[in-house]
Amino acid sequence: MDKLFIKSDVLLKDSFQLAWNVYESGFEPNYIIGVWRGGAPVGIAVQEFLNVLGIKSDHVAIRTSYYSGIGERKDSVQVYGLNYVIRQLESEDRLLIVDDVHDTGNSVAQIIADIAAACKKNTPEIKIATPYYKPNKSQTGNKPDYYIHEPAQWLVFPHELDGLSLEEIIENKPELANLIDKIKHHI
């Protein structure tokens, strides 16, 4: 499997660029959802950057459950942690959903469906932002409103270790160099 190892500084740079793209578009979200796990650091950077530019927003992380391992998916997407946002949202609000990658689109589609079902007439304007978009993997036809890259490879984000070989960790995770001797028998 061809893998793209994303460095933390590159992800942060892309997150700030993503925020700038949102800002330049004129969309001013007053709510931002970062999709836990990978969308949380991207969402934090987007929120911070927009805040510096004068766009204030309430921001939370929610969780979806869909992947059970590299390339292995469960049958349906479960969304956790939307209660706070649903209680707050009004129809005139603007919600930005931020994730690390938009591939099948199923997770974001389920988040939007759950928000729409709960908010009904109070469903706000919703836009999607992600540094990485995989149009060839889409199962929903949804396209993020804001994205930076269209990679074909399997993405390995800075925090990800599960499913990597010891050789991949040594080669692509220099931040672990001082711990390799201590952890190699666990891998």
State the predicted function of each range:
Residues 1-187:
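PRPP-associated nucleotide enzymes
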